[in-house]
């Protein structure tokens, strides 16, 4: 077993990587990862929102972005079904242009493919995109996609980790995102 805080560093690169990191070194085989995954997914499909909720202020920020005709997409390393379910549950009033989770055959973040897919779908240029995330994986993803990066310091990883990846901006609270983008708060 691991200390709960250790899991903050196990997550972020998809569930297979989570299992690999959590397993003892001598047990880190593809067969073991797949076995755990087969047991985990049915459980997580039922319990993925347990002890989970949007960060303070995020719903208001999303509503403000939407009210200002800003297109919003999601690129996550959670598997696709879980990503879609969580977004629909927590943000039913937000019109996302695309919600992409981890999918078979598509590289996980920090590979930029999911971000680039969303950009292509809505035909926006890199200069018009801000990628927001709370980890080094997110900052790498945004940089790999060639877009503006905004680090959210209230997430799973410490502010110092975000700073090490030199995002264009670090938001210490949700409303800071609007200020950086030049959008007035409602």
Positions of PLM-derived features:
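Alpha-helix N-cap/helix-start and coil->helix boundary motif
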Residues: 12, 16, 59, 79-81, ...
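Structural signature of beta-strand start/N-cap positions in the alpha/beta core
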Residues: 68-71, 128, 148, 168
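Short acidic-hydrophobic, aromatic-tinged amphipathic segments that line or gate anion-handling sites
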Residues: 169-173
């Amino acid at each position: 077993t691991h200390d709960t805080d250790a899991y903050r560093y196990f997550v972020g690169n998809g569930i297979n990587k989570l299992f690999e990191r959590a397993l003892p070194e001598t047990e880190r085989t593809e067969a073991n990862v797949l076995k755990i995954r087969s047991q985990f997914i049915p459980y997580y499909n039922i319990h993925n929102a347990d002890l989970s909720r949007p960060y303070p202020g995020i719903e208001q920020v999303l509503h403000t972005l939407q009210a200002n005709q800003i297109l919003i997409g999601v690129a996550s390393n959670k598997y696709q079904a879980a990503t879609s379910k969580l977004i629909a549950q927590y943000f039913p009033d937000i019109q996302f242009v695309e919600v992409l989770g981890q999918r078979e055959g598509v590289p996980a973040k920090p590979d930029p493919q999911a971000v680039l897919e969303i950009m292509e779908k809505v035909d926006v240029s890199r200069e018009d995109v801000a990628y927001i995330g709370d980890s080094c994986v997110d900052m790498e993803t945004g940089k790999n996609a060639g877009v503006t990066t905004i680090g959210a310091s209230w997430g799973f990883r410490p502010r110092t980790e975000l700073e090490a990846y030199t995002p264009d901006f670090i938001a210490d609270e949700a409303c800071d995102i609007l200020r950086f983008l030049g959008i007035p708060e409602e």
